[in-house]
Swiss-Prot record:
Monomer. The active site is at C1137 (nucleophile), H1262, E1264. Gene3D superfamilies: 3.40.50.880, Phosphoribosylformylglycinamidine synthase, linker domain, PurM-like C-terminal domain, PurM-like, N-terminal domain. This is Phosphoribosylformylglycinamidine synthase. One of its GO terms (cellular component) is cytoplasm. SMART domains: GATase_5 (SM01211). It comes from Histophilus somni (strain 129Pt) (Haemophilus somnus). Phosphoribosylformylglycinamidine synthase involved in the purines biosynthetic pathway. Catalyzes the ATP-dependent conversion of formylglycinamide ribonucleotide (FGAR) and glutamine to yield formylglycinamidine ribonucleotide (FGAM) and glutamate. The lineage of its organism: Bacteria, Pseudomonadati, Pseudomonadota, Gammaproteobacteria, Pasteurellales.
Length: 1297
């Protein structure tokens, strides 16, 4: 039974305007358009009137917009037929938690109603639907009733076989094409031989499983191959050269090359988590660091948002599935694409070269892909703190003569760090009889063949196979799974997880064989035990689909009840689908058809398949020098500042949460003006320590068009110069991930790959003492297609991306690029590791003038590079550096400009001592760094540089000036004289243009104007209370602690830092899941206070916090329990972010809240992660007692934080009753509605409210993430351990006596 509920208008005015702009570009005869949400309820039986009203109320969410009666021709966009959207999964969960159990499934679509001034042609109709839906993720039907196709169920399909006993090689070769297996000829021979020996035909499931498990993507055949180059056999494989770094420098590495991530030694700190009694406590223990970096290039090319989202999601699962369970902590994301070609923003280096229709454009990838990666990290609850973005697309004379090189097949990099207990670093043994479990979401017919598909050059696979390999993301489900893993590893020696892997490429067909094989066992499985959302799937589709957010585990039978209880509490789906066997055989039984889709010896599936031999020839390049004759410095700088690799990247940063965990010490944004120029990311190891972790990225991929080895060396070196200004100590503490992207088989590239791997694996890294314990390769970076009868291709440069990871001794000592004006007289020094060579080949300067040049930068002297790192470490330890920024893309002139942008100051520079060629001096990208040093410290700094052999490379540049001017001279000749604010505006143009295309253009314009304002004062802080006064001391000395419920729902992700803040204030912080209240394991009558934590309950489906609130309001027992708690006179309640949204939806049961508004989508219509300033007002709130008149920065991370009132009188009443506890203010300290000082557009900057008796408070920003000073992106130097917001938690402790 299907019931359709109309929803609110789906598009805001500016979204409609954007849509109409596209229609106008296509010359479509559209007079009007109206779009509204439709909700489709698939019911087991008819609803009662009460149930119908409840469901209607549940489906009422979002900003209030005036609906209209639809008219015109209807086009309904629904989830792709045959799939179940992640929205549906979460909305259905909410319905069931509201006791609406007749709802089998909820889905959502958008109905578009168009009025035309004439009938559309078939081509015009295609243009129209292309503007309103994504064919990879959605379908179009022509009426709401036709959406019933979403809920059709089909009978299960049987497996098929390939008749090789009769047809031999020919039959398998045909199946290789139709199934998209990407099998090589020797693999076909291998399979025919083995199945002939078994005396039977292979099933399609077995072939698909073999193809995925043995794809280049999964088995890394090229990196394990034997090599012959120019007729000479090479001694080592690529992988052996990488492993050489570990053989030479095994120091501090605990696990390498054998798990989902590598592990290195960390610090002994207090890890904070709840014990089995539910109380959060610190646990002093060795907390090691895990690291992993993946790529997800093919899916991102086909469908950017889910491709990038599942790229981040898969890498997060890799971290969680390390050892016997670990905790992901902080992430990185990177993109390489072809030229953007932004409409109305043409750049002189861009040509509108063509592309195949099946892949997304570079612009679409950079609009949708970053949103996907950010959305997954945000919803999972992992801060994304680091990244890179490069564009390249040019016809160049390289190793094969003139050809187009670029990133039509993009690079989507996803990586990060996590933590793991010492006892869980190594995986356990799998005993015979161990239960084999799939943890996570149900199987769906999506993401088929991703491993094999990503192993082909783009264009080799059929478009329908590309379509099938697109995946779907549900980060809230992955968060639930991670909570299960966390509960398990937190049990220490009682951890029920013996073995764990994530489910990625190839689905269960790769994950389960890998699990049992690594555990030395076989496995017997029952197909129909696998959770499935689509009953008509074939065995191949069930076993091989790549439905995301899944893990496979081995659990001993006696620990199974414990594991089940943990899963049920976290509402994480799981299924016991088999058990480990002594016999090395993989058997998959199908009880529905009473047959075995798989019955295969493990040694055939994962045995000695034929080893690849790469017999290749090297190539040389002979390119002319960079023609400098027509290049002027000012115009060159303007161009370079607009080049995406150099330009400001705020549009990629503020979409990502950078404060969740409460352990972020250095994000991308630097200083009071929050300028995105940080060289590295830094986290604290725990919530009670200054030890930590750092990570950085190095990449110089265009250099590979001239010199493969130099490109690899520079990537390693840049990762070091980026991380050098944090307190690491021994360079051997740094561990690298190497991600290799190449167009294998393209002339010269294979030999170039070998040359690059050798350059760092055999030479540079061993010489520096660096280890590469982890990495990934993608060997199909070429796009080919037919166009008007011609064969076309675009080939990516050989691309090595290096990510560096290190333990940090003291995170407070990290030095940023922000030039300081508050430290007296100072000097700027350049440490030139290029030794004056000033080479310009493959630089940003060359790129913006559509050239390549001849000789690129390179590592000149390895010992000096090592000496440079050691010198910086000494200066960091001694706190002799005021600012530090490495030289990279754009050269010295960009390094200096970015430092001035961060410091909101001017500079006066003389380059006389740096060489004779002005362009070479200013725009070369040789290794090096600029440091700012106090004049009084110059002698001591020079002594350190002398000690490390660098003094002859150190040149004094000039001074910092307290004005809005950047001046560069050669002695008395002025080379550049320009306002800093003008250059700052040019640097920001790319972000401005991308934000206008993607977000609310009014908001984009407001932020752009703010960046150019020389009078912007940036962030500041003024406190009306003593930050260091221990106001809770008298109460803590009593020896009793009030109990606070740290309340969370599925998808909440900020509970650890919240608990830590209350624990520090003197509370017993107790972990309380909503399922505990539902099942009676906890009751609110046992608590003195509750806090509803931030995150994404139910993934913000049905309105942020709305589903959580309605699961309380529509459950009589829970409603009564919460109402009783709020009406007690001895309790306190706080709601932060998602908890704020939730409590605002509970206002009807909270006394004194009749004028509260509710929180809806931000004005920008984008998730906003910012550091904003707020002012505390004078109210009755006990939470803000003594803080009135203060203003200070605070972390903001939300997508729905704009307050909306039913009527204006509510706002006036709040003001009259003094219930507005805090407001966003601008740099002039006035309440503001201007973006981004007000990140969500709330009226009068409202961001916190109190109820009338002062005991309940709600606020959208996150005080719990910045209760320690060190976790503020910027804070005054006189702040010590506690941050300004610790007082809020202390006030609560005082209020309870």
């Amino acid at each position: 039974m299907l019931h359709i509920f109309r929803g609110t208008p789906a598009l805001s005015n500016f979204r409609l305007n954007q849509l109409f702009s596209g229609f106008q570009q296509d010359n479509l005869p559209i007079v009007s358009c109206y779009a509204e949400f439709l909700h489709f309820a698939h019911l087991s039986e008819a609803l009662t009137e009460i149930e119908r009203e409840k469901l209607e109320e549940l489906l009422r969410y979002g900003p209030t917009q005036k609906s209209q009666e639809p008219y015109g021709e209807c086009f309904v966009v629904i989830p792709r037929i045959g799939t179940i959207s992640s929205w549906a999964s979460k909305a259905t969960d909410i319905a069931h938690n509201c006791d609406l159990n007749k709802v089998l499934r909820l889905e959502r679509g958008i109905a578009y109603y168009f009025k035309f001034n004439r009938t559309l042609t078939a081509e015009e109709e295609q243009q129209l639907v292309f503007r309103i839906y994504d064919p990879m993720m959605e379908s179009i039907v022509r009426s709401p009733q036709e959406a019933a196709v979403l809920f059709e169920q089909h009978d299960p399909k049987p497996f098929t076989t390939v008749d090789i006993l009769t047809g031999g090689h020919v039959a398998l070769e045909k199946a290789n094409v139709t199934l998209g297996l990407a099998l090589a000829k020797d693999e076909i021979d291998y399979l025919v031989e083995n199945f002939t020996a078994l005396g039977r035909n292979p099933t399609d499931v077995e072939l698909y499983m073999f193809a995925q498990a043995n794809s280049e993507h999964c088995r890394h055949k090229i990196f394990n191959a034997d090599w012959i180059i120019d007729g000479k056999k090479q001694d080592k494989s690529l992988f052996k050269m990488i492993k050489n770094t570990f053989e030479k420098t095994p120091d501090y590495v605990l696990s390498a090359y054998k798990d989902n991530a590598a592990v290195m030694e960390g610090s002994k700190v207090g890890r904070f988590f709840p014990d089995q009694d539910g109380q959060y406590r610190y646990h002093q223990e060795d907390t090691h660091i895990l690291m992993k970096v993946e790529t997800h290039n093919h899916p991102t090319a086909i469908s950017p948002f889910p491709g990038a989202a599942t790229g981040s999601g898969g890498e997060i699962r890799d971290e969680g599935a390390t050892g016997r369970g670990a905790k992901p902590k902080a992430g990185l994301v990177g993109f390489s694409v072809s030229n953007l070609c932004i409409p109305n923003f043409p750049q002189p280096w861009e040509n509108a070269l063509s592309k195949p229709s099946r892949i997304a454009s570079a612009l679409d990838i950079m609009i949708e892909g970053p949103l996907g990666g950010a959305a997954f990290n945000n919803e999972f609850g992992r801060p994304a703190l680091l990244g890179y973005f490069r564009t390249y697309e040019e016809k160049v004379n390289s190793f094969n003569g003139e050809e187009v090189r670029g990133y039509h097949k993009p690079i989507m990099l996803a990586g990060g760090i996590g933590n793991i207990r010492h006892e869980h670093v190594q995986k356990g043994e799998i005993p015979v009889g161990a239960k084999l479990i799939v943890l996570g979401g149900a199987a769906m017919n999506i993401g088929l063949g991703g491993g094999a598909a990503s192993s082909m050059a783009s264009g080799k696979s059929k478009e329908d196979l590309d379509f099938a390999s697109v995946q779907r993301d549900n980060p809230e489900m992955e968060r639930r799974c991670q909570e299960v893993i966390d509960r398990c590893w937190q049990l220490g020696s009682e951890n029920p997880i013996l073995f764990i892997h994530d489910v990625g490429a190839g689905g269960l067909s790769n994950a389960m064989p890998e699990l049992v094989h690594d555990g030395g066992r076989g496995g017997r499985f029952e197909l129909r035990k696998i959770l499935c959302d689509e009953k008509g799937m074939s065995p191949l589709e069930i076993w091989c689909n790549e439905s995301q957010e899944r893990y496979v585990l081995a659990v001993s039978p006696e620990k199974l009840p414990l594991f089940e209880a943990i899963c049920q509490r976290e509402r994480a789906s799981f299924a016991v689908i088999g058990e480990a066997t002594e016999q090395q055989q993989l058997t998959l039984q199908d009880s529905h058809f009473n047959n075995n889709p798989i019955d295969l010896p493990m040694n055939i599936l994962l045995g000695k398949t034929p080893k690849m031999i790469r017999d290749v020839k090297s190539a040389k390049v002979n390119n002319p020098q960079l023609d400098q004759s027509m290049i002027q410095i000012k115009e060159a700088l303007f161009r370079v500042l607009r080049l995406p690799a150099v330009a400001e990247k705020t549009f990629l940063i503020t979409i990502g949460d950078r404060s969740v965990t409460g352990m972020v010490a250095r994000d991308q944004m630097v200083g009071p003006w929050q300028v995105p120029v940080a060289d590295c990311a830094v986290t604290t190891a725990s919530l009670d320590s200054y030890h930590g972790e750092a990570m950085s990225i190095g990449e110089r991929t265009p250099v590979a068009l001239l010199d493969f080895a130099a490109s690899a060396r520079l990537a390693v070196a840049e990762s070091i110069t980026n991380i050098a200004a944090t307190d690491i100590g021994d360079i051997r503490r740094i561990k690298l991930s190497a991600n290799w992207m190449a167009a294998a088989g393209h002339g010269g590239e294979d030999a170039g790959l070998y040359e690059a791997v050798k350059a760092i694996g055999e030479e540079l890294c061993p010489q520096l003492g660096l280890t590469i314990p982890v990495g990934k390769d993608s060997m199909s970076m070429k796009t080919t297609w037919q166009e008007e009868g011609y064969q076309k291709s675009v080939t990516a440069p050989l691309s090595v991306i290096i990510s560096a990871f290190a333990r940090v001794e003291d995170v407070r000592k990290t030095v940023t690029p922000q030039l300081r004006m508050d430290k007296g007289d100072s000097r700027l020094l350049l440490i030139d590791l290029g030794e004056g060579k000033n080479r310009l080949g493959a630089t940003a300067l060359a790129q913006v003038y559509k050239q390549l040049g001849d000789v690129p930068a390179d590592v000149v002297n390895v010992s000096l590079l090592k000496g440079f790192f050691n010198a910086m470490q000494a200066l960091v330890k001694q706190e002799k550096l005021l600012a530090y920024h490495d030289r990279s893309d754009g050269g010295l002139i960009v390094t200096l400009a970015e430092m001035a942008f961060a410091g909101h100051c001017g500079i006066s520079i003389d380059i006389s001592a740096l060489g004779d060629n002005d362009l070479g001096v200013l725009f070369n990208e040789e290794l090096g760094a600029v440091i700012q040093v106090k004049e009084s410290d110059l002698k001591a700094v020079r002594a350190v540089l002398t000690e490390h052999g660098l003094i002859h490379l150190t040149k004094e540049l000039g001074i910092v000036t307290a004005d809005d001017h950047i001046e560069i001279t050669r002695s008395t000749r002025v080379l550049l004289s320009e306002k800093r604010s003008v250059l700052r505006g040019i640097w920001a143009e790319l972000t401005h243009q991308m934000q206008r295309l993607r977000d609310n253009p009014d908001c984009a314009d407001q932020e752009f104007e703010m960046k150019k304002d020389p009078n912007d004062k940036g962030l500041s802080a003024y406190l009306t209370y003593d930050l260091n006064e221990k106001i809770t001391a008298p109460y803590i000395q009593k020896g009793t602690k009030p109990r606070i419920a740290i309340l969370r729902e599925q998808g909440v992700n900020s509970h650890y830092e919240m608990a830590a803040a209350f624990d520090r204030a003197g509370f017993n912080a107790i972990d309380v899941h909503m399922s505990d209240l539902q099942k009676g394991r906890h009751h609110l009558q046992d608590f003195n206070a509750l806090v509803a934590c931030g995150g994404f309950s139910y993934g913000d489906v049905l309105g942020a916090g709305g589903g959580w609130a309605k699961s309380i309001l529509f459950n009589t027992a829970l409603r009564d329990q919460f109402s009783a708690f709020f009406h007690r006179q001895d309790t306190l309640a706080l709601g932060v972010c998602n908890g704020c949204q939730m409590l605002s939806n509970l206002a009807e049961i909270i006394p004194g809240t009749e004028n509260w508004g509710r929180f809806v989508r931000n004005k920008s219509e984008r998730f906003e992660a910012r550091v904003a300033m707020v002012r505390i007002n004078n109210t009755h709130s006990v939470w803000f007692d003594g803080m009135a008149g203060s203003h200070m920065p605070i972390a903001v991370s939300h997508g729905e934080g704009r307050i909306e009132f039913k009527h204006d009188q509510q706002l006036q009443a709040l003001k009259a009753q003094n219930l507005i506890a805090a407001q966003y203010i601008d740099s002039q300290l006035n309440p503001t509605e201007i973006y981004p000082a007000n990140p969500n557009g709330s009226a009068e900057g409202i961001t916190a409210l109190s109820n009338s008796n002062g005991r309940v408070a709600i606020m959208m920003p996150h005080p719990e993430r910045v209760f320690r000073a060190v976790n503020n992106s910027w804070y005054p130097e006189n702040w010590q351990e506690d941050g300004a917001w610790m007082r809020l938690f202390q006030n609560a402790r005082v209020a309870l006596g």
